[in-house]
């Protein structure tokens, strides 16, 4: 007899005997309380009959509970003995040969597929996060760190403006209560300017910021690149512009010396020196006399040194003449010889 047929016959014999034993056990368990009730009914002793019936029912229930609990404990103890990484593919675990063969073939195939799928064929780019370097186009330079959260960066920029008054990390803004990001951008880069490029970029910057912050959708990589590019543009504008320059269209034509500025800084810096009108046309290559400087040193001899220029106008006419027709203009970078000849030191004891 082949081994396979013997295994089949042995399996069927085991199952048949097991089924017969279970049937007899269930039958006797059912007959026992019924027989006890019948025997007690025929007896004349009521107390004994009650004890027999109740005892039979309690014994049946107790035996059933013991069998069920014992079965559960036995199964769990058997499961604990099996290692967690153990695969039931042996003949004892899975007697069917075809099933074992199919499992082994699929396991080998899954191993090959895991190697193929380890690196995706197409770049996987999730909105809101900077993809890793392997997903970038090798022809372009890596712009941001891997897995950078775009929304967190933009939120950090707005939080610094809201709580610290710092705009684009280089400008301290005295914000008023109720001002928003759009109000700050408009006040700084849209008003008092006629630069069309700057105005258009300001509007794009505001629209892009509001779309990113309040659209409810994840920030795409292109949106974040555009936002960073505009932020860098406005940083350069804020670093290179002159806040003291007059605003176009706001000049006060009624006066040639007073300008109407928003911040009022130049109004306080107007020189009070009384130069003639033609003196401004000479440029900055000429030296105008300054006030006399005194150098005083106190010691045992009480020596006082006074530093005076070699030529000092004695009256307003000579001062005006020197300003209009200077004889020896002084350069901004005088030589050592010129410096030595330009000053005299008079010592008084």
Swiss-Prot record:
It comes from the Eukaryota. It is a multi-pass membrane protein. The keyword Membrane applies. GO terms for cellular component: membrane. Residues 40-49 are extracellular. Residues 312-333 are annotated as: Disordered. Its main location: membrane. Belongs to the DLT1 family. Required for growth under high-pressure and low-temperature conditions. This is Defect at low temperature protein 1. It comes from Zygosaccharomyces rouxii (strain ATCC 2623 / CBS 732 / NBRC 1130 / NCYC 568 / NRRL Y-229). The lineage of its organism: Eukaryota, Fungi, Dikarya, Ascomycota, Saccharomycotina.
């Amino acid at each position: 007899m082949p081994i396979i047929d013997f295994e089949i016959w042995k399996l069927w014999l085991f199952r048949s005997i097991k089924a017969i034993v279970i049937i007899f056990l269930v039958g006797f368990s059912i007959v026992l309380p019924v027989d006890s009730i019948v025997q007690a009914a025929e007896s004349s002793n009521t107390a004994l009959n009650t004890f027999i019936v109740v005892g039979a029912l309690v014994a049946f229930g107790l035996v059933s509970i013991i069998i069920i609990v014992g079965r559960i404990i036995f199964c769990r103890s058997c499961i604990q003995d099996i290692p967690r990484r153990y695969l039931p593919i042996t003949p004892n675990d899975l007697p069917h040969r075809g099933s074992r063969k199919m499992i082994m073939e699929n396991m080998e195939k899954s191993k090959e597929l895991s190697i193929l799928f380890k690196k995706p064929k197409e770049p996987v780019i999730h909105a809101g996060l900077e993809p890793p370097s392997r997903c970038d186009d090798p022809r372009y330079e890596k712009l941001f760190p891997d897995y950078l959260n775009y929304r967190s960066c933009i939120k950090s920029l707005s939080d610094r403006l809201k709580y610290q008054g710092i705009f684009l990390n280089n400008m301290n803004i005295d914000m008023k209560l109720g001002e928003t990001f759009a109000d700050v951008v408009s006040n700084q880069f849209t008003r008092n300017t006629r630069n069309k490029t700057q105005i258009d970029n300001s509007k794009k910057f505001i629209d892009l910021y509001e779309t990113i912050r309040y659209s409810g959708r994840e920030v795409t990589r292109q949106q974040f690149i555009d936002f960073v590019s505009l932020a860098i543009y406005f940083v350069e504008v804020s670093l290179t512009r002159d806040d003291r320059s007059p605003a176009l269209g706001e000049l006060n034509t009624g006066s040639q010396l007073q300008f109407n500025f928003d911040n009022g800084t130049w109004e306080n810096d107007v020189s009070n020196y009384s130069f003639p009108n033609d003196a401004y046309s000479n440029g900055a290559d000429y030296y105008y006399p300054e006030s006399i400087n005194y150098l005083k040193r106190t010691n045992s001899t009480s020596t006082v040194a006074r530093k005076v220029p070699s030529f000092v106008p004695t009256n307003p006419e000579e001062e005006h003449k020197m300003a209009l027709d200077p004889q020896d203009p002084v350069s901004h970078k005088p030589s050592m010889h010129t410096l030595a000849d330009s000053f005299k030191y008079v010592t008084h004891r």
